[in-house]
Every structure is written in structure tokens, then in C-alpha cells.
Amino acid sequence: MNIKTPSTPNNVDQQEIEKFEAIASRWWDLEGEFQPLHRINPLRLNYILQRSGGIFGKKVLDVGCGGGILSESMAREGADVTGLDMGTEPLQVARLHALETGIPVTYVQETVESHAEKYPQAYDIVTCMEMLEHVPDPQSVVHACAQLVKPGGHVFFSTINRNKKAWLMAVIGAEYILKMVPKGTHDAKKFIRPSELIGWIDRTSLREKHIIGLHYNPLTDKFSLGHNVDVNYMLHSQYV
């Protein structure tokens, strides 16, 4: 099956890059701006492990890796991990933290589209978590991820649904009321409906295998997974 060539080789929003560069030094501060990422990471990792059948000894690419939270956790599970990002400061933080912990992760500053041209079908697993809503052309990212994975391999995406409830919870609630993330972290116009993401996936060699919601309960201050995908969700696809 043919995979569409990515149409946006320089698929970068400089304002988004600068936004995360400004707070990159606090990426591994468990009480800082990235606390939610640290708290949901076990849920993300377990989902990847369960749906892929395990990642030990597998070649994994983490697209939009930022400071390396997910990348390091996958490397701890025995995967050969490459983290990909366009932010200079987040990658410096990621490399330093990997040196401090002794966890081997290879970090590369490059767009996923460029990486796909160099390394087609090079990875057993590709993850693209909380990244699609921060680029000008998310469909191009999906196509590139499809190019990068081997036949039979797995690609995982996570993003935010686009509807009024998601705007209220992910922007108004998380940024302005609960102050879980900095104001301006999200642009609701860039949120992505599951039907849109699945449509992009269906135009590649990938097929959607499973979708699940990621929920936050402000009363219990707990994150959990569930069937409701109204706000945050994760999607598992496979090269078939």
C-alpha cells in the first residue's frame, strides 16, 4: 500500500517552539509546568506496552520528545530509543538528564518529515504524544510516522479532541482555573477530532486498532484511562 509523501518538510510553528524553549529548564521539575506530563506518563507507557506486546529490544522513535520524559521511560523498558524534536533547549535538557541517569537515549534535532526521508521503515514502534496539536500540518506528521514504521509495526498518537467540552477542560480549566499548565499552552483551533485523525491514518499504510480516553478528575486529583474520548485521547495504529 502506498504512503503519501509528507507535504510539509518544514512543518514547524516557531511560536510553539519558543513557547517550550522558554520553560525547558523545568522539564524534569516534578512540581513545575510539566507536572501533568510526569503524572500521565505511566498511563501512556503502560498503554504502549500493552498494545504493542512489549518494547524490550525494539527500535522506538519518540516524535516530539521534548525533554525526554516518555523517551527515558521507554528506554528503561529495554527499548532502543531515538527522541526527535525541533526545540534546541528541550533537547539539551533531555541529553543532560539522560547523562545524569545513565539511560541511553539518542536525541536528534530534526523534523519527522526529514527523518522519514532518511530512515523509511526503520522503527518497530513510533510514538507521537501531545505533539500533533502544536504543528501547522498534523496530517503531514501522521504520514511521516507511517513512513518510519516497519511492516507490522505500531504507531501511537495522543492529542486533544476539538469540541466545546475539550476547550472548557483543556484550556479554560487546565490553564486558567486549575493552572495545571501555563496559559497559552494550547490553541483550541488546533485540536483534532478522532474522526480527523483516523481519516489521516486511513490514507497511509496504517490502520487504527484502538482508541482510549485520558481523563482527569479534579475532585480526586487523579488521571485515568476510559472509553470517553471527548477531551484527551490516545490512539494505537498498526502498519498492516
Curated annotation (Swiss-Prot):
MF terms (GO), sorted A to Z: 2-polyprenyl-6-hydroxyphenol methylase activity; 3-demethylubiquinol 3-O-methyltransferase activity; polyprenyldihydroxybenzoate methyltransferase activity
Catalysed reaction equations from the record: a 3-demethylubiquinol + S-adenosyl-L-methionine = a ubiquinol + S-adenosyl-L-homocysteine + H(+); a 3-(all-trans-polyprenyl)benzene-1,2-diol + S-adenosyl-L-methionine = a 2-methoxy-6-(all-trans-polyprenyl)phenol + S-adenosyl-L-homocysteine + H(+)
Keyword entries, A-Z: Methyltransferase, S-adenosyl-L-methionine, Transferase, Ubiquinone biosynthesis
Amino-acid positions noted as binding S-adenosyl-L-methionine in the UniProt annotation, renumbered to this chain: R44, G64, D85, M129
Enzyme Commission code(s) on record: 2.1.1.222, 2.1.1.64
Entry keyword Metal-binding: no
Pathway terms, separated by semicolons: Cofactor biosynthesis; ubiquinone biosynthesis
Biological process (GO), any one: methylation
Domain of life assignment: Bacteria
Pfam families, per database record: Methyltransf_23
Uppermost EC category: transferase
Its biological purpose: O-methyltransferase that catalyzes the 2 O-methylation steps in the ubiquinone biosynthetic pathway.
Similarity remark: Belongs to the methyltransferase superfamily. UbiG/COQ3 family.
HAMAP family documented for this protein: UbiG (MF_00472)
Name listed for the protein in its UniProt record: Ubiquinone biosynthesis O-methyltransferase
Species for this entry: Photorhabdus laumondii subsp. laumondii (strain DSM 15139 / CIP 105565 / TT01)
